[in-house]
């Protein structure tokens, strides 16, 4: 089963905690909002992605399971 990483742009305040936790999957430009570099990352990245989602202080990130 696959998964997709999603961001709620209304909640993101650009704290960049996700980028600190998983820089290969998230980027936050100065005074910007999160950019998800790979919205459907490999299964082996799930642990680091979950940690980055957990680290978001505004809970702007989420993981959605896909049927694939």
UniProtKB/Swiss-Prot annotation:
Encoding gene, per UniProt annotation: fdx
Main function: Ferredoxin that is the redox partner of cytochrome CYP51, a sterol 14alpha-demethylase encoded by an adjacent gene.
Cofactors demanded by this protein: [3Fe-4S] cluster
Keyword Transport: yes
Annotated residues for binding of [3Fe-4S] cluster: 12-13, 16, 18, 56
Anything else known: There is a positive driving force (of about 95 mV) for electron transfer from NADPH through the redox chain (FprA and Fdx) to CYP51. Thus, the overall process is thermodynamically favorable.
InterPro entries assigned: Fe-S_cluster_ET
GO molecular function (one): metal ion binding
Domain of life: Bacteria
Keyword annotations from UniProtKB, A to Z: 3Fe-4S, Electron transport, Iron, Iron-sulfur, Metal-binding, Transport
Textual note on the cofactor: Binds 1 [3Fe-4S] cluster per subunit.
Name of the protein in question: Ferredoxin Fdx
């Amino acid at each position: 089963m696959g998964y997709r990483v999603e961001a709620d742009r209304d909640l993101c305040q650009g704290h960049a905690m996700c980028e600190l936790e998983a820089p290969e999957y998230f980027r936050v430009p100065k005074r910007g909002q999160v950019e998800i570099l790979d919205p459907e990352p490999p299964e082996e990245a799930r642990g680091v992605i979950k940690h980055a989602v957990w680290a978001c202080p505004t809970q702007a990130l989420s993981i959605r399971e896909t049927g694939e």
